[in-house]
């Protein structure tokens, strides 16, 4: 019989909220022997009026810097996993550069990789309509093909 949650997706953005979400995912993984995928997303959409790069494109040096930062975030989670005695081989990491929105990228990655749970952190203070859930988390909850656990 298939475990309830065999593949867990956790978006990491370097915030305390995303690290807290990773802790929940680790705990769930311990219970169900789930595989965890940590992703960090760089939205590379060309923005009119940005001063970064030609015509607002994100310069390669920034992308490399962001990727290095994301690897540090992943390592922080992996250290927690080691400390808790879980198998690191069950954890995958991926830095994604995309012109799509962060929400769309999370959803596509979840579907493509057959995630059966998304665990996402939110600070929940991005405006009146989204007072309880942040805009990215709200979009993921609204459109995800699988259950979403929102951590505050």
What are these regions (language model features)?
Residues 1-3, 79-118:
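Structural beta-alpha unit
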Residues 2-58, 83-86, 90:
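Small/aliphatic-rich secondary-structure junction motif
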Residues 24, 68-80, 105-107:
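Short, solvent-exposed amphipathic alpha-helices that sit
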Residues 57-73:
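A short acidic, glycine-rich active-site loop
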């Amino acid at each position: 019989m298939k475990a309830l949650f065999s593949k867990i997706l956790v978006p990491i953005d370097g915030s305390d909220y995303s690290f807290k979400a990773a802790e929940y995912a680790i705990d769930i993984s311990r219970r169900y022997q789930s595989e965890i995928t940590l992703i960090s997303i760089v939205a590379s959409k060309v923005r009119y009026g940005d001063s970064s790069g030609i015509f607002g494109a994100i310069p390669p040096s920034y992308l490399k810097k962001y990727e290095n930062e994301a690897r540090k975030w992943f390592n922080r989670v992996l250290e927690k996993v080691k400390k808790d005695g879980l198998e690191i081989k069950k954890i995958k990491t991926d830095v994604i550069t995309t012109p799509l929105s962060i929400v769309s990228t999370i959803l596509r990655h979840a579907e493509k990789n057959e995630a059966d749970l998304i665990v996402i952190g939110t600070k929940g203070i991005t405006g009146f309509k989204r007072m309880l859930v942040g805009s990215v988390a709200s979009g993921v909850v609204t459109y995800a093909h699988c259950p979403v656990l929102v951590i505050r």
